[in-house]
Amino acid sequence: MSEQFIQFPQIDPIIFSLGPISLRWYGLMYLIGFAFAYWLGMKRAKASGGVWNGEQVDQLLYTGFWGVVLGGRVGDVLFYSFDRFLQDPLFLFRIWEGGMSFHGGLIGVIVAMIWVSYRQQRSFWQTADFIAPLIPFGLGMGRIGNFINDELWGRVTDVPWAVLFPSGGYLPRHPSQLYEFLLEGVVLFGILNAFIKKPRPMGSVAGLFLVGYGVFRFVVEYVRDIDPNVNTAADLITRGQLLSLPMIVGGVGVMLWAYRSNKAE
């Protein structure tokens, strides 16, 4: 029966090692995502008519990078592994044993944007609108890293494109990482970068990002395997969906406020 499904490609998560230092596919995917965001950010800065310059983009992306790393790790521990953290506080620092949470990373980036906006004496929403279209590609690369790592796979299914993941018991499962790559990485990137081709009210781009990611993540959670460490309300809604709902509601609220209060930029 397993022959009708797709065998997971056996890929070593470590590309190469030099002594104690190893380069992993997961880390490389994030580096590619960050490099692309840097390139696109510089390109947009040159086209901004002096609103942004290279030094300001450097500061924003550097600070945002640490917001993603620190917020993502703390969020993963608090949202998904809090019981383990209480038993072993040093688990927080062992990133290779747990991973990072998008929602925690988002909180970290928001804190970073508040600080950068203050330093650059500009509106928070101007900063958020600038960085929002840079994010999806990196998210997509992160999901490719999850796929290579044989983690965060989907629920058992009999669809023809089901994948037999080794760590998933070689049961046919939804390749939910690839669904998220397509929706959060490709489709959301296309939507946001098409949206900004015309002048938009301040805050509307950030609001659209929140709605888009929240909706896509909420939908994919229906086929993504439930984290055994997380208890949800009668298994009717996952932790990821609970965390995505405020994004959707908040994003709609931001867009309504933006179109009612601000002029197109």
Curated annotation (Swiss-Prot):
Sites where the protein binds a 1,2-diacyl-sn-glycero-3-phospho-(1'-sn-glycerol): 143
- Which domain of life, per UniProt? Bacteria
Write the Enzyme Commission number(s) for this entry. 2.5.1.145
UniProt keyword terms in alphabetical order = Cell inner membrane, Cell membrane, Membrane, Transferase, Transmembrane, Transmembrane helix
Q: Does the keyword Oxidoreductase apply?
A: no
The yes or no answer to whether the keyword 4Fe-4S is present is no
Q: Which residues cross the membrane?
A: 14-34, 60-80, 95-115, 176-196, 203-223, 236-256
Q: Which GO terms describe its biological process?
A: lipoprotein biosynthetic process
User: What do the Gene Ontology cellular component annotations say?
Assistant: plasma membrane
| One of the record's GO molecular function terms | phosphatidylglycerol-prolipoprotein diacylglyceryl transferase activity
The cellular location(s) given in this protein's UniProt record come to: Cell inner membrane
The annotated pathway is: Protein modification; lipoprotein biosynthesis (diacylglyceryl transfer)
Membrane topology (UniProt): Multi-pass membrane protein
> What does the UniProt function comment say about this protein?
Catalyzes the transfer of the diacylglyceryl group from phosphatidylglycerol to the sulfhydryl group of the N-terminal cysteine of a prolipoprotein, the first step in the formation of mature lipoproteins.
Xref: HAMAP family: Lgt
Q: Which family does it belong to?
A: Belongs to the Lgt family.
UniProt-recorded name of the protein? Phosphatidylglycerol--prolipoprotein diacylglyceryl transferase
Organism annotation = Haemophilus ducreyi (strain 35000HP / ATCC 700724)
